[in-house]
A protein has these predicted regions:
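Enriched for short, Lys/Arg-rich terminal
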Residues: 2-5, 10-17, 24, 55-60, ...
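A short, surface-exposed loop/turn module that caps and links secondary-structure elements
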Residues: 31-56
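Compact soluble domain cores
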Residues: 21-35
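Short, charged low-complexity linear motifs
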Residues: 1-2, 45-50, 73
Length: 95
């Protein structure tokens, strides 16, 4: 089963600010995650059903949650890892 992709409004703003080359890298990984969104190695500790995609070379993270009832991968945040900024934004962005 393939999941659909949706963005939190603030995550969409963050996405649009990314350089096109970074967006392409995330798109490749998101395509894989839409087929299999629950990757145990990418699960965030301390968050219920939240996962991350890392672009290590540039230090960016994309954090998403999985909504099985509507078959959606919901992007919560996109940003740099420095000072855990991207992870702290999750508190106010739960779906």
């Amino acid at each position: 089963m393939t999941y659909n992709l949706e963005f939190h409004p603030l995550a969409l703003k963050e996405w649009k600010k990314l350089a096109p080359s970074f967006q392409q890298q995330f798109k490749k990984k998101l395509q894989q995650r839409l087929a299999n969104p629950r990757v145990p190695a990418s699960k965030l500790s301390g968050h219920t059903d939240a996962y991350k995609i890392k672009l290590r070379t540039i230090g960016y993270r994309l954090v998403y949650t999985v909504k099985d009832d509507v078959v959606v991968v919901y992007v919560l945040a996109v940003g740099k890892r420095e000072n855990n900024k991207v992870y702290e934004s999750l508190v106010s962005r739960q779906p």
